[in-house]
Amino acid sequence: MMGEQDLNPLGFHRHPPGRRMPSMMSPTAVLRDGAPELVLGSAGSNRIRSAILQTIIRVVDDGLQAGDAVDAPRVHFEDGIVYAEPGIDTVPLERAGRAIGRFRELNLFFGGVQAAARDSRGRLSGGGDPRRGGAALVVEA
């Protein structure tokens, strides 16, 4: 993390002494009636939050299994540019005058979400982000 430009703009080994190191890490648990419904985290610097939020929306609101939610195309807004993977409809954004940064394929730029979920029927699912070589496997006991 010391060399991470987003977290340490002064450069490697130049973090001010005595100051807490900033972090974008945000391990997340979504609970339903006090029990875990979805747990997830991601790599990806300042894109972590958008990757996690989009995965949560796809599982909780759209009802996708964790793997399908993790694999789904993502979008990220930064510095006035909307970055989008294939599968994101950018036409409304373009009509609104937004600058678009298009990617030709899924890309590690959009984070690396790892997720485990339990649906309303108690079925487990997992997702390991293909953008960063992730893998998930549900083992029935």
Show which residues each predicted segment covers.
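Terminal-appendage/accessory-domain detector
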Residues: 64-65, 81-84, 90-141
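Proteins synthesized as precursors that undergo proteolytic processing into mature forms
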Residues: 1-104
